[in-house]
């Protein structure tokens, strides 16, 4: 079974009764809010991850990767997903290296897209970012995105160096802040490393609509020097703003690894710095890319994705805008919307893969 101890270890109590003893008698009737939180985002059945993967035509496993870093090795929690039943000789169509967004992680709803791609013939790999999920660092504290870029690159390259992956095309895939990280990876590596990038509602520049007004940035800059970990930056409820289907908001909120506090000062300052850099360097982007964005997204600005598509030097670049969709395009929308976006991503990736030798 692919259920590693890291996956099985977390049996989470209900969020509404955090201090209750596991042996306390259960109340006779429970509302939906009081029911024990599911251990998996899809609910009670199937009971294990490996059964869920198998039911969706995929296989998966989780482990820890330790970065080969001179300044002290760091541990990242990682996952991989492959097409089911791939024997020793079976090769995936390509490798997809996936990066999640701010406050999120790779073990909850983010997995659904990876499982979909694995079922479609791709081998997918992802890691919890520093300060997220089960990886190193204070929760939701990202004082230096360069550390995240270096950690992910070390993991992605270790996967790519495996003998069975020789010669396979390698794609980057990023959601929201993960989209920004994918572009930073591209700007810091040679173009021939990547066959392309899929950017889902990427955070390429903080929208003027939500960027703090003067004198707030100046005050934040000053305070963040002394107290970078303070979780005090005012922000809207991200789940409310991102997820359209109300029942899915409850699922997102029940992610036991999710950070629900206010953004930390140092994280916000670093995101402003990194997105300012990206905004200024859009013309240097040469990687083939697909950018998908919902027209009603209030978390990352669809106008910035249009600017990216306009300004990028890439010869192969595609933008798809989805009328009325919000920020969480691959989970928070009605199923038919998710299918549309998935289908467009799959078609784009498939066109850029070398056909299998059997075709």
List the model feature ranges, each with a label.
Residues 21, 27-70, 75-84, 234-240:
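An N-terminal hydrophobic leader/cap segment in hydrolases
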Residues 105-108, 133-168, 336-340:
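Catalytic nucleophile-loop/oxyanion-hole region of alpha/beta-hydrolase
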């Amino acid at each position: 079974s692919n259920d590693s101890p890291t996956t099985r270890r977390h049996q989470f109590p209900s969020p509404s009764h955090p201090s209750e003893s596991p042996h306390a008698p259960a109340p006779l009737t429970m509302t939906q809010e009081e029911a024990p939180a599911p251990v998996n985002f899809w609910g009670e059945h199937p009971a294990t991850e490996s059964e869920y993967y198998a039911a969706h035509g995929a296989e998966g496993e989780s482990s820890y990767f330790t970065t080969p870093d001179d300044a002290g090795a760091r541990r990242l929690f990682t996952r991989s997903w492959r097409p089911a039943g791939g024997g020793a000789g079976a090769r995936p169509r390509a490798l997809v290296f996936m990066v999640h967004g701010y406050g999120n992680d790779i073990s909850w709803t983010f997995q659904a897209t990876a499982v979909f791609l694995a079922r479609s013939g791709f081998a997918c790999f992802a890691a919890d970012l520093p300060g997220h999920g089960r990886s190193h660092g204070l929760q939701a504290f990202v004082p230096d995105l360069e550390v995240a870029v270096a950690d992910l690159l070390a993991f992605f390259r270790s996967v790519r160096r495996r003998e069975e992956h020789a010669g396979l095309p390698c794609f980057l895939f990023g959601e929201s802040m993960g989209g920004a990280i994918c572009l930073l990876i591209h700007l810091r590596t040679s173009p021939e490393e990547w066959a392309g990038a899929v950017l889902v509602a990427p955070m390429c520049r903080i929208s003027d609509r939500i960027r703090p007004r003067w004198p707030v940035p100046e005050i934040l800059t000053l305070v963040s020097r002394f107290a970078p970990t303070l979780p005090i930056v005012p922000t809207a409820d991200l789940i409310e703003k991102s997820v359209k289907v109300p029942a899915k908001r409850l699922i997102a909120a029940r992610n036991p690894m999710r950070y629900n506090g206010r953004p930390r000062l140092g994280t916000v300052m670093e995101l402003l710095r990194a997105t300012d850099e990206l905004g200024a360097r859009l013309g240097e982007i040469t990687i083939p890319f697909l950018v998908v964005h919902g027209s009603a997204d209030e978390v990352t600005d669809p106008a910035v994705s249009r600017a990216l598509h306009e300004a990028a030097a890439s010869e192969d670049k595609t933008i798809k805008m989805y009328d009325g969709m919000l920020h969480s395009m691959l989970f928070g929308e009605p199923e038919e919307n998710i299918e549309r976006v998935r289908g467009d991503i799959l078609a784009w990736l498939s066109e850029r893969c070398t056909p299998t030798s059997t075709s």
